[in-house]
Amino acid sequence: MKTKNVTSSQKHSSLNRATSKKQIPISNVTADEIVAVGSTIELTLGAQVDPQSAQGAIRVVRGCEQVATDIALAKRGHVVTVRLDEAVIGACELIVSELLGTKGERLVDYYRLPFLVVPISGKIPNGLRVEHAVRLFIDDLGVVRLAPGEATRAGHVDVVKAVHRTKGTPVELAFDERGERVEIDKQLAQLAQRRADKYGRIHDTLFQRIEQAKESDRVPIVVWPRLELPPASYNKPADHRSVEPPEGEKKVTATIRKASAALRAVLQRSKIQLLKESRADEDVPCMRATATVAQIRRLAENKAVGAILFDDVSAINDLADSIAVARSDRAHVDGFDGTGIRVAVFESGPSVTTNLVFADRFTGSPSASDHARLTSAIVKNIESNKPHGHAPDCDLFSANSSDNDALRWAVNDQHCTVISQSFHRNSEPGGSGLQSDDVLKDFLALRWPFPTIVQAAGNFFVGDEDGIIPIEDEFVNHKGYNSLAIGNHDDTAGAMSGSSVFRNPTTTHGDRELPELAANGTSVSANGQNMSGTSFAAPATAGVTALLQDVDGVLCSWPEGCRAILMASAGRNIRGGTWWQDVVSGVDARDGAGAVDAQAGVLIAQQRRFRDAPATRRGWDVGTISSSVIGQDRLATFRYRVTVPNLIFFPKVKVALAWDSAVTSFLGFPLASTLTVDLDLLVRDSRGVQVASAASWDNSYEVVEFTARRGETYEIIIRRWSGTDSVWYGVAWTVTGFSLVDVVAFPFDQLTVAQIQRP
């Protein structure tokens, strides 16, 4: 890839020439921009730079390593050029510290410019800025993302998100290994058609099972009708909690019931018997049955059928420190304890309910389970002289069966707005894409009462029940777009557990990132139990979600808002680079957006904002994005604004955006949970300069975080890269840092040597 350096005269005709004031360098590279190998970065200043100071004050780092550069001056000393070594690839930062002018005056105190070096086979047209790029290998039935610069004998395709530097116009490009332009949309459409030709309406997991079976063998299945529903069929109320189905929901329900009736008639004509114990729930149109392989193949040819999936009914189970490290205790002190919030723990058991108080239970005779005793107690318990859970005053429901009927009971009958799940099915760890349960939960999140669903990412270890070899090849167990998968960190939020599953699912552009978050699941004790695993990180996050909903009831009806606040408030990055740096670099991160933080989340939840509102340090909003609020430049016509207080030292801004997939039959393809809209997240400073971006293809969320300037105000901008569907979204932001009060109150006497030495 070749890029044209933008000169200082082209970009800035009138610089402030005062040399007595500290300056912000003007760069020809935008924050988080992708540049070519061996590129030159220019920094323009309003005064002459001292050559010796430039050599000492300017450096480029990749992680903790300083990389080789050639530094020179141009334009009579007003421009510093930094040429990168050809060997530099990956996420980097250009850092300027105490840069002096020729008269000895300090021109720059401190300046950081994050950017990425990614090899791209083709030439990027002049005037375009690259914001994201992935290298893909497309085979007969799937996509493999290659590492930056990696090559294969079969070739590759580099796919690029770029924008015009001055107009901001989005441009998508793709190049083959020879640098020739190719039509990536056409290639992906051909891939989708090849998959449809092979699998038809049969999910690939089920397809693989029946390929090894006899035509007369009976197989448990889940059948969905053909549905054509956008992710947001109506404008969901955003100013109050929806205590009953909104008016628009009634029209959706009518559509669902019509499709369900048609499917039921098809099953009857096919002489396929529904399971007797399956719930008669017309609001959730999928139906469980057992059918022969021959019946399944014939059923897949019926146009009333949306998809046929394998009905996996297996269930494999995956407190004081937990509460403290998530800072839920600080939220309790502020008066938020989950009062009035309905939370369900979805898993088999417990039969022993000592120190547990349930508002109701799915069945009165569940199986015995110490695992379920602990997951329930993490949310809420009444053990004497012990912490009472993350949401001690919530209404806790026991969906005490691994059967999905228990999940539907919790959502549709008990109207729970938070669901915690800490088990997985046999087929999920080895499945590279969404499985049957993922589709169901994505559907439930889109229908009243709009639950926020939190799940354990999974655990791997030698000898585990999943039997995947090597063990690190296990996929994150729950892959839905409209829910959250949670990893496991230690008691200090300083390290991820070595057993916490992190492998990302396979997607069209290979940049999906799971899990979304991490919470403490290591050596968690409550109610006489002590265990470790992501199983215990999930209920901790569910409890924190209940605290957020306690702050503002609107969040009970907006899982998109809950997801955004949880990710924006996760200010502790446990491992690797920032979320976006890991995504662009192709690093399969383990901690997602970071460690769950109830205190930070509550502070955000207390600051509900609105479109184009004055700037605040923290805030959140929810709503519907439709074509009516998208301009010709694909940017939303409204803004959110964040301000950085002057008395905050080392400030950082973190912003998260979350939206939904659609559970629908799309253009004649089988029903699936599909992202029909691709949103990006941009942040600009008061000069209009872009300071951060996150622009993945395959996620239902974006996260940006960057070092900010005190006293500055930033604009948060949503861009719709592709798609036309209306979609519900949530956005949240916060500024973190240190104040004088923080320094005075810091417990230096409790700081250990290990904490000081931690990288």
What are these regions (language model features)?
Residues 237, 587-677, 731-749, 753-758:
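Secreted peptidase-domain scaffold signal
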Residues 312, 417-526, 567-570, 651-663:
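Catalytic-core segments of hydrolase enzymes
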Residues 518-581:
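Hydrolase catalytic cores
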Residues 138-159, 221-228, 306, 326-368, ...:
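Acidic-leg catalytic submotif of subtilisin-like serine proteases
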Residues 581-591, 677-735:
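Noncatalytic accessory or regulatory domains flanking protease catalytic cores in secreted, cell-surface
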Residues 120-307:
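Inhibitory N-terminal propeptides of secreted protease zymogens
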Residues 7, 12-37, 48-50, 55-59, ...:
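Acidic, Ser/Thr/Gly/Pro-rich low-complexity segments and short DxT(G/T)-type signature motifs
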